[in-house]
Amino acid sequence: IKNYMSEKYLIFGATGSVGSSLAEQLKNSGSDIHLIARNESEVKAIAEKLGCSYTVANVLDEGFIEKVKMDVAEIKGMAYCVGSIDLKPLRMVTEADMNKCMKLNLYSAIEAIKGFQESLKKNKGSIVLFSTVAAQRGFTNHTIIASTKAAVEGLTVTLAAEFAPHIRVNCVAPSLSKSKIA
C-alpha cells in the first residue's frame, strides 16, 4: 500500500461503519486523516484510537464547512461517508422527508466539496462519494434514499467532468452492509 504521509484526508461521517472502517484503513496505510462527525464522544474515541485530529460538526447545520475549515486548511482527498436510511412506502413520504435526506446526502456534500475545491485542485486530489445500489435497482420502500443517492451519482459524473483533470471524483454504491443504519 502506498504511503500517503503528509497528505491530509477528510472523512465526513467518520463514526459510521463505512467512515470508521475507511479511517482505520487510511491510518494503517500511513495517511494523515481528519475525522468529521456530529457525535463528539464517538468521534473523539475513534480519533484517540487512531491518533488523528477531528472536528465535531453536523452537516445539517448551516456553516458546518467553515467549522471544519477552521481545523483543516489543505487536503489531498475527501470521503463523504454520511448516510441515512428512511424506508417507507411512497404514500407516507413527505416533502420534509425528502428535504432532510437531500440536505444530508447531496446539498451538504456539495458544500463540503465547494469548501475544499481549491485545495483539492492545487493538490490534484480526489473525492469519494457514497450512493447505494438502490439508486440503480428497484427496492420496495426506498423512494427517499434511492432518489437522493441517484442525485449523488448525478453529482459524481458531473463533477468528474467539471474537475478533470485536476480532481478525481468517484462514487461507491454498496448494497446492504453490516452497519448501524442497515
Language model region names:
Residues 15, 23:
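N-terminal Rossmann NAD(P)H-binding glycine-rich loop of SDR-like oxidoreductase domains
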Residues 89-90, 94-102:
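Substrate-binding pocket helix/loop in short-chain dehydrogenase/reductase
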Residues 93, 138-146, 158:
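Active-site loop-to-helix junction immediately N-terminal to the catalytic Tyr of the SDR YXXXK motif
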Residues 113, 148:
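Active-site helix of classical SDR
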Residues 118, 160-165:
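Alpha-helical segment proximal to the catalytic Tyr-Lys
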Residues 132:
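Residue(s) in the substrate-gating loop at a strand-loop-helix junction
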Residues 163-177:
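Conserved Rossmann-fold SDR core element
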